[in-house]
Amino acid sequence: MYKRLLIIALSLLFSGVAFAQEQQDPWIWPDDHIKDALFLRIGVGPRIGGGMAMATEPSFFDFDLKGNLAYQIGATLNFQMANHSSVKPHGIGHWGLEIEALYGSRNYKSGDETMAMRCLEIPILLQFYITQGFLLEAGLTTVKLLNVSPGYLQTGGVVAYVGGIKGNDVMFSAGLCYKTSFGLDFGFRYNYGLSEWAENFHSKSSAAMVSVSYLFSLIK
């Protein structure tokens, strides 16, 4: 199932890239533009994503936790920095920074029950542009758990109080993205949880997500 998710995610990403490549290249500078200059782009806009949430099996329990759907919606603030030269007009070592505020829900299956964890996510990611539009990104995502439903999880005669799962997590996030010239971005990201759900519930979260965002330029 996870392989199918990955195939679908990559198909969506490259479909967006194929469409975007028909547009004008945003990194081509006119001949009369001043080169050898450091510049900064700032963009802000909405972001929406979906994918698969996964969790490791907790120690001392056999809940047979399985992955299920996850989604997130929110806003993103993006900074792009580059140093252009007359030798390489497309730029040398493009760097960027992305800060997001997302409301998300991660769902997990255990037998006939579905557990939903709703949370606030704050990713802070360093970005490196490997071409004019393609970039790699990596960083940390701070997660604040808002609520869990249902409060109890039961399977095989074992009942666990999951409403007491702690409210904070830190996830390592890495992915790739394609930015178009007209503001639409397509991305794939993997998040791996570094914290356990609770002292007596040793399970960690992860998620594979595809997303679409649209950036309005504040500074070009």
Task: Name each model-derived stretch.
Residues 74-78, 123-125, 175-177, 211-213:
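Outer-membrane beta-barrel architecture
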Residues 56-62, 109-116, 148-155, 198-204:
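Outer-membrane beta-barrel translocator domains and adjoining extracellular loop/strand segments
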Residues 174, 178-184, 204-220:
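Outer-membrane beta-barrel "beta-signal"
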Residues 84-87, 95, 134-136, 182-188, ...:
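Repeated loop/turn-to-beta-strand initiation elements of outer-membrane beta-barrel proteins
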Residues 16-20:
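Sec/Tat signal peptide C-region and signal peptidase I cleavage site
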Residues 21-85, 193, 215-220:
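Short glycine/proline- and aromatic-enriched beta-strand/turn motifs that initiate or cap beta-hairpins
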Residues 38-44, 65-73, 116-120, 168-172, ...:
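Residues that define the transmembrane beta-barrel architecture of outer-membrane proteins
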